[in-house]
Amino acid sequence: MSQYHIPVMLSEVLAVLAPKGYESYLDCTFGAGGYSNAILNSCYCSVTSLDRDPNVIESVEKIKQDYGERFNFIKTNFADSFRKLKHKKFDGIVMDLGVSSMQLDIADRGFSFLYDGPLDMRMSVQGFSAEEFVNTADEEEIADVIYKYGNESLSRRIAKSIVEYRKTARIDSTRKLAEIVRYSIGFRKGKIDSATKTFQAIRIYINNELEELEQFLANVKNILKKDGRLVVVSFHSLEDRIVKNFFKENSEKQVARSKYAKDEIKIDPNKWLKIITPKVLTPSSQEIRLNVRARSAKLRAAKKII
C-alpha cells in the first residue's frame, strides 16, 4: 500500500468517527489524503472526498489506485458541495479546516512567510489573490481584515505601513509582506512570528473560509444520516467558535431524569445533534513534538439523533 501523509489528530478522529464496514463517509477537506486513506484502511467502507485545490490530483489518483470504486473525489468548495453531492447522505463526516501542510510547504502557493514566493494564498488558484488585495484595498479595509480575521490588535499600524510601502513598489512576495509587518510592529517575544496573524487573516479573507464553513454547517443536516457523526478539526479561535456555537445551538441540553418519570420525552426537532465531545479534544504532547503545526488543533464532534 502507498504511503500517505499523516494528518493532525488522526487517532482521535478515527476513535470519534468510529468507521464501520459498508458505511459511507465524507472527507470535506481531502488535502494530501491522510484522513480518506485512514478511513478506507480501517474497514470495508466507502469515502467521498472534497477539495477545491487542483494540486491534490496526484494524491487523489494514488488513493484511487489503492481503493478503486470505494473512493470518489469531487473538486469543489464547501459552498458548492451540496449541489454536487446530489442529496447523497453519509454515516460520518470529517472536516479538517484551514490550510494544509502541503499548501504551506510549496513556496509558489504563497501561504507561508517561511518561504519566499509569490503573494498568492488562493486555495483554488482562481479569483482574487493576496497580492491584488494588499496592493488595491484601501487602508481601512486592510486594517479591518487583519483585525477581524487575525485578532491582530496592531492592525491599523500594519495597514498604514502596507499602504505607505506600495506607494513606491508593488508588494508581490511573501517575504516583502512579512518584512513590512515585522518592521511596522517589531518582533514579538515568544515562538509566534509577528507576521503570523496578518498572513492568517489575509488567507481567511481571500478564501472566504469562515463564511463557507458557516454555510456548510447550516446545510450539513441534509447529508448526514441518523446516528451519523460530524467531526471537525479547527486550528484557530474563529473557526472553533463557529463550530462550538453551531453544536451548542443545535443540541439538546442533557438533563438528569428519574427512571420513574412516566411522561414521554419530547424531542425538539430543531435540536438534532448530541455533542459527543463535552470537552474539546487537543493533540497529545507527543504529537506536538513531532508536528509543531498541530499545537493549535481542536477537535469537536457531534451525532445526529433525529
UniProtKB/Swiss-Prot annotation:
The keyword Phosphoprotein does not apply. GO terms for molecular function: rRNA (cytosine-N4-)-methyltransferase activity. This is Ribosomal RNA small subunit methyltransferase H. SUPFAM superfamilies: Putative methyltransferase TM0872, insert domain, S-adenosyl-L-methionine-dependent methyltransferases. It is found in: Cytoplasm. It catalyses: cytidine(1402) in 16S rRNA + S-adenosyl-L-methionine = N(4)-methylcytidine(1402) in 16S rRNA + S-adenosyl-L-homocysteine + H(+). Its EC number is 2.1.1.199. Specifically methylates the N4 position of cytidine in position 1402 (C1402) of 16S rRNA. Gene3D superfamilies: Putative methyltransferase TM0872, insert domain (1.10.150.170), Vaccinia Virus protein VP39 (3.40.50.150). The lineage of its organism: Bacteria, Pseudomonadati, Pseudomonadota, Alphaproteobacteria, Rickettsiales. Keywords: Cytoplasm, Methyltransferase, rRNA processing, S-adenosyl-L-methionine, Transferase. GO terms for biological process: rRNA base methylation. GO terms for cellular component: cytoplasm. S-adenosyl-L-methionine binds at G33, G34, Y35, D51, F78, D96, Q103. Belongs to the methyltransferase superfamily. RsmH family. The gene is rsmH. CDD domains: AdoMet_MTases.
